[in-house]
Design a protein with these regions (language model features):
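C-terminal structural segments of small proteins and small subunits
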Residues: 47-75
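Charge-dense, helix-prone N-terminal extensions
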Residues: 7-13
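Local beta-strand/beta-hairpin segments that build beta-sheet-rich folds
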Residues: 1-4
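A short, structured beta-strand/loop element
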Residues: 15-47
Length: 75
């Protein structure tokens, strides 16, 4: 499970056996969400609204880097 970033209590990662579309998993405490990288669509969410909002901001800011790391790992 490659961890891409740890920030503000959030852990941004993907699993070694992922599939398209490119997406990232985010955990904070016991809460988690899954965000598609290209569209920033939330496909699963079990986070508090303020944490989800912050997670989306962080993913948007790091979007290009997360996509690059996805491509490096899976290609």
């Amino acid at each position: 499970m490659p961890t891409l970033l740890m920030l503000e209590g959030f852990k941004f990662f993907f699993y070694a056996n992922e599939h398209e579309p490119k997406h990232i998993h985010v955990m904070k405490g016991g809460d988690f969400t899954k965000i598609e990288l290209q569209s920033l669509a939330v496909t699963h969410n079990y986070m508090k609204p303020k944490d989800l909002k912050r997670a989306l901001e962080i993913v948007k800011y790091n979007q290009a880097e997360f996509e690059r790391k996805w491509d490096e790992y899976f290609n």
